[in-house]
Every structure is written in C-alpha cells, then in structure tokens.
C-alpha cells in the first residue's frame, strides 16, 4: 500500500508502535524494534473491502479509534522490545474484538477457516493467526520471535490454504 501507515511502517523498520498520530518530524512518534520474520498473508480473492468503507463512517471511526487507543495505551506501558511480541499478539486480538472488526461475518469466517487448517496441520503451538486491520485478510505469524516459522511449515500452510481457494503470499517483517 501507499497509505501513511504503510510508509511509516517501512520507515520505522521492524515492528512499530505508533505512539502519536502523524509522521516522525511532523508531530508523530514511533517506536520500533527490529526482527526478521517470515510470515504469510491470506485473503479471500473474491472479497474486497475498501479502507474508505471504514474511515468514512463515523461509527467505524469511533470504534476503531477507541479500540486502538486502548491497545496502544497498554502497549506503551513498558519498553518496546523484542520481548513485547506476546503483548502485541494479545493486543491485536483485543483490538479486533473491541473495534467490532471481528464481528463482521466474512472476517470471522476467514479467521475460523484459517485456524482450522492450522489445527489440522498441528501447528497451533507455533503460529498466531491475526486479522489485518482492514480488508478481509489475516496474517500468519510466529508465536515466538525466537522461534521463526520454518520454510517447510510456511509451505505446508500456504499449500493447504491455496487448496481451499485462499490467496496466499509469503512476506516478512524486516
């Protein structure tokens, strides 16, 4: 993408925590830690949601902003380091629930189907599946940063999900 969040993520590198809106140097404040982690993005090819559906709607604006502020408030209480990954995974789940994004049936169904494949592959102890903020997509992430997902595990997951009709792309946190 080319939105502000994408640009800031690229400029901060690694895993960012945006403390204040805006970009660094223009009022924004971002913390980050570096890690290199392979991951998968998964989506339903026939489903599309445009960001404007959410950011142009007052109800969505309010619920997303409130949920995000609560999560950031909890995350900023301690130093932002590699060891905070489990906290980030917890807050990403909390955000999806509190914002109402997880209440949309198409998202809930996608998350459920991907989680079922992870269980079938017996990789639930190694993987977190998290909704992407907008659109109908999920990220498949390592449960622990000191135990990156292996190429074979990523290939097995990708093959299983493609066989079920999902779009899958391998990418990474850098």
Language-model regions: role of each:
Residues 33-91, 95-98:
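Acyltransferase
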Residues 11, 41-45, 132-133:
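Short beta-strand segments
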């Amino acid at each position: 993408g080319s939105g502000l969040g994408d640009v800031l993520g690229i400029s901060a590198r690694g895993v960012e925590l945006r403390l204040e809106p805006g970009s660094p140097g223009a009022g924004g404040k971002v913390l980050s830690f570096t890690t290199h982690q392979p991951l998968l993005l998964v989506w339903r090819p026939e489903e599309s949601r445009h960001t404007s559906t959410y950011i142009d709607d007052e109800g969505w604006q309010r619920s997303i902003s409130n949920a995000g502020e609560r999560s950031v408030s909890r995350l900023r209480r301690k130093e932002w380091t590699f060891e905070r990954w489990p906290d980030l995974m917890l807050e990403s789940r909390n955000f999806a629930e509190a914002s109402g994004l997880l209440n949309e049936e198409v998202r809930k169904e996608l998350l459920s189907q991907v989680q079922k494949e992870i269980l079938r592959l017996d990789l639930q102890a190694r993987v977190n599946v998290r909704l992407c903020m907008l659109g109908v997509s999920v990220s498949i992430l390592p449960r622990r940063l000191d135990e990156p997902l292996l190429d074979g595990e990523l290939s097995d997951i990708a093959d299983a999900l493609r066989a079920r009709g999902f779009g899958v792309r391998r990418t990474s946190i850098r």
